[in-house]
């Protein structure tokens, strides 16, 4: 991607208003978002640290979209059963209890940059992460996981579950939130290990992963610069490193 186009997109995205319901970046991931946006080759386009929500939808309506739902309760932290019960009392349709894990969308300058970020996400436990390339050349890396939870609680305002089962669901959702926050922390640590300058000492403890990040970072740096004086043996060694890295992304 052309450097000027990428920088223009980055400036436009970071300077526009936040149209989310909350209107700001979630506190638990603000350090991650700030770190990514400080990098020349990345910027975030949307994010959510993870949330527990209770929403009400129109009964017998197959089109369950945000515009057809009302939020009865939402938190980005662990929740209490009393909060869910109070929200459920407001239901006039079909209430659903849901946990949504951390999600982050990052626009990347080059495909190699997205591949590096993808490796970080996978190693941090976000196994559903992926890369998309748009028609205009926009490269988006989405950090996602699959440990969601979605359970219907009422139909036509009639509650379908007992208080005991509701208490169980709240406990499950809170456990998922705890695991979600641990994965965010791992992602933050892996991210800093992968993107910090080459000369700085890496604080990430897993040596194998450091090697992967170092190799991928080296490939990214070598995209625009080729050493014409490189001898045959060095070229062969670098080729083996690139093949090794490519195999990692096929696993």
Swiss-Prot record:
Broad EC category: transferase
Region span, Disordered: 213-240
Superkingdom assignment: Eukaryota
Cellular component per GO, a single term: cytoplasm
Keyword annotations of the record: Methyltransferase, S-adenosyl-L-methionine, Transferase, tRNA processing
Catalytic function, reaction form: 4-demethyl-7-[(3S)-3-amino-3-carboxypropyl]wyosine(37) in tRNA(Phe) + S-adenosyl-L-methionine = 7-[(3S)-3-amino-3-carboxypropyl]wyosine(37) in tRNA(Phe) + S-adenosyl-L-homocysteine + H(+)
GO biological process, one term: wybutosine biosynthetic process
Function: Probable S-adenosyl-L-methionine-dependent methyltransferase that acts as a component of the wybutosine biosynthesis pathway. Wybutosine is a hyper modified guanosine with a tricyclic base found at the 3'-position adjacent to the anticodon of eukaryotic phenylalanine tRNA.
Protein name as annotated: tRNA wybutosine-synthesizing protein 3 homolog
Organism, scientific name: Danio rerio
Lineage: Eukaryota, Metazoa, Chordata, Craniata, Vertebrata
């Amino acid at each position: 991607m052309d450097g000027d186009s990428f920088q223009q997109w980055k400036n436009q995205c970071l300077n526009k208003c936040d149209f989310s319901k909350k209107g700001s970046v979630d506190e638990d991931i603000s350090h991650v978002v700030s770190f990514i946006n400080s990098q020349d080759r990345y910027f975030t386009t949307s994010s959510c640290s993870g949330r527990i929500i209770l929403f009400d939808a129109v009964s017998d309506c197959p089109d369950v979209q945000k515009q057809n739902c009302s939020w009865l309760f939402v938190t980005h932290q662990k929740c209490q059963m009393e909060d869910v019960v109070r929200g459920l009392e407001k239901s006039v349709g079909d209430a659903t209890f849901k946990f949504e894990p951390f999600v982050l969308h990052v626009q990347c300058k080059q495909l190699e940059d997205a591949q590096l970020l993808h490796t970080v996400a996978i190693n941090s436990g976000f196994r559903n992460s992926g890369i998309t390339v748009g028609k205009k050349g926009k490269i988006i890396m989405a950090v996602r996981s699959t440990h969601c939870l979605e359970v219907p609680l009422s139909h036509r305002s009639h509650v379908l579950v007992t208080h005991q089962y509701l208490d169980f669901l709240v406990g499950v959702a809170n456990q998922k939130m705890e695991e979600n926050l641990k994965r965010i922390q791992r992602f933050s640590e892996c991210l800093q290990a992968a993107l910090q300058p080459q000369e700085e000492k890496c604080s990430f403890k897993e040596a194998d992963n450091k090697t992967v990040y170092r190799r991928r970072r080296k490939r990214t740096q070598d995209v625009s610069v080729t050493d014409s004086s490189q001898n045959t043996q060095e070229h062969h060694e670098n080729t083996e490193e690139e093949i090794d890295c490519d195999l990692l992304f096929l696993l």
